[in-house]
Amino acid sequence: MASTASVSTSTASSELSSLSNNINNAADISVIVIYFVVVMAVGVWAMLKTNRSTVGGFFLAGRSMTWWPMGASLFASNIGSGHFVGLAGTGAASGIAVTAFESHSFALLLVLGWIFVPIYIKAGVMTMPEYLKKRFGGKRLQIYLSILFLFICVILTISADIFSGAIFIKLALGLNLYLAILILLAITAIFTITGGLASVIYTDTVQAVIMLVGSFILMVFAFVEVGGYESFTEKFMNAIPSVVEGDNLTINSRCYTPQPDSFHIFRDPVTGDIPWPGTAFGMPITALWYWCINQVIVQRCLCGKNLSHVKAACILCGYLKLLPLFFMVMPGMISRILYTDMVACVVPSECVKHCGVDVGCTNYAYPMLVLKLMPMGLRGLMLSVMLASLMSSLTSVFNSASTLFTIDLYTKIRKKASERELLIAGRLFVSVLIVTSILWVPIVEVSQGGQLVHYTEAISSYLGPPIAAVFLVAVFCKRANEQGAFWGLMVGLVMGLIRMIAEFSYGTGSCLAPSSCPKIICGVHYLYFAIILFFVCILVILGVSYLTKPIPDVHLHRLCWALRNSKEERIDLDAEDKEENGADDRTEEDQTEKPRGCLKKTCDLFCGLQRAEFKLTKVEEEALTDTTEKPFWRTVMNVNVILLLAVAAFFYGYFA
């Protein structure tokens, strides 16, 4: 038995390693080198152009960004390499329904730009936990949410992107997995540590263009190869692997036959893999957390020149979010047509032979298209696309995570830290994240058998709804208080962890081997669980809040929707804490700073510490709370919202 397994594994290794020969040519390597040169050049330009020597400059780009790089960065930060692998893989397995996770985001982007960002800007905050501290007071909400956000970054974004990026690295370059990941993370960290948010956004913009151009070219090649859209819809329904029996297993035909509703977004509420009530009501809840509360996304909006630029960026990203169906999901489905025996394999021994994984090879759908369908030169372009999506997503996570650590956690440890110390701490924390990311790789490799999209969305459904509930109530119900918010989060955390730990312990199962997790815990689809969890948390928040003392309005001006336009002075709930730990006491180090040598000055220039000051400039302070718009541009934004909603309505009407 052991010898058989080793033979199968070696066969898979040789089969996969042979694909790396496809990219060992001057044309592909030249394209990849050019990609790295261009991205590094843009990163260096952004480092030199922008102010990185203040907290506002490093973490919020001095609130000087225009709409188009912001919109491109929102898209690039969201679309990691996990999307190319995960969306294409799930599309190959079950059809277009998975695109709902992407296309429904347009509505939440509008909610972000028109409702949440104005509140965040008027609150004058840099991080989402900081908003909760201003809104509710106390420290426990801010600290808890910061730690939870960092935990989610590691188990969701970083793990999914590194895993999916590793698939391309292994297939295309034949490099040692850990060496390749170390190189990528090192380059990614250089942008984040030295350049700040402005550098991240500008490199994101370049990488978004590369992603869109490359994935569009691959889509065209894929549709030409399959014979057009009509031929594609017909052939997909007949894409059944040649080997459907073996390993002494009785395999149900539904495990390898394309689903009858493969070309519909809305599916059966009971038997559907993505049930339509979950699509309609569960996805908006997880999307509310991701698009309106997630530090990675909101931080990009907080750096806009004004609110009109923020709204325009959200609209641009909304249009771009309609593209994954055509650029990722459908190419994954075409890969099943072209490479049916590998992508749609169902017999475990056959899957091991093709890709080394016994539960399926759908995650290899997109990489197979890139390496087998694209000609020389374009293969290098597509690998650059994968590197771009991986690096843009990771730079975004690293920058936002360092912001959370510095603003919400480090200042609690070092209450009198100088501005220079805060900047250095934020940069060093990125290094800690890199080490954590590398240590997480073996865990990701062990869990690589399932469909990546369902893994990420399930985790979001277990941890995201309590956060969404707290922020929604915080903005729209001024009666909510700190006790209600805290206990709502605690109840939600316990419920979410019970479900998540149970699934990790028993496994999520597959078509061949259903999970043995008790039905009372795991019997409800994760999107339905998100709905239940969300409303339970809201009930707890409101119930506890109405049973305890309310927060006086003097502490809530411009922190909630009802008082968003209030002109009265706000007394922050943490005002006493601020006085106790005032800036004057923590600046003695900077005031008595000794002259620095040439080497230290060069290092400071590289890291943006050469003009370190302990306060934001007056312009930055005013910009942080300014939400004024010119009437003309406000009207232009509102008209574009109507156009986007019309396009989205047609999209859902056609594919639902």
Curated annotation (Swiss-Prot):
Mark the transmembrane ranges: 29-47, 65-85, 106-126, 172-191, 209-229, 271-291, 315-334, 424-443, 456-476, 527-547, 635-655
Q: Outcome of E457Q? A: Confers sodium-dependent sugar transport activity not found in the wild type protein
An annotated GO BP: proton transmembrane transport
Q: Where is this region: Disordered?
A: 574-593
In this protein, the residues bearing a glycan are N248
Primary site of residence: membrane
**Hydrolase as UniProt keyword:** no
Membrane topology designation: Multi-pass membrane protein
Name one molecular function that GO assigns to this entry.
proton transmembrane transporter activity
Activity control note = Not inhibited by phlorizin.
Look up the record and report any one GO term of the cellular component aspect. plasma membrane
Q: Where in the cell is it found?
A: Cell membrane
- Topological domains on the Extracellular side lie at 48-64, 127-171, 230-270, 335-423, 477-526
Could you list this entry's UniProt keywords, alphabetically sorted. Answer: Cell membrane, Glycoprotein, Membrane, Transmembrane, Transmembrane helix
Record flagged with keyword GTP-binding = no
Domain of life (superkingdom): Eukaryota
Write out the tissue specificity statement of the associated record: Expressed in small intestine. Expressed in kidney.
Q: Which residue ranges are assigned to the Cytoplasmic compartment in the record's topology?
A: 1-28, 86-105, 192-208, 292-314, 444-455, 548-634
Identify its protein family: Belongs to the sodium:solute symporter (SSF) (TC 2.A.21) family.
Question: What's its job?
Answer: Does not function as sodium/D-glucose symporter. Generates D-glucose-induced depolarization in a pH-dependent manner, with activity in acidic conditions (pH 5) but not neutral conditions.
Q: What is this protein identified as?
A: Solute carrier family 5 member 4A
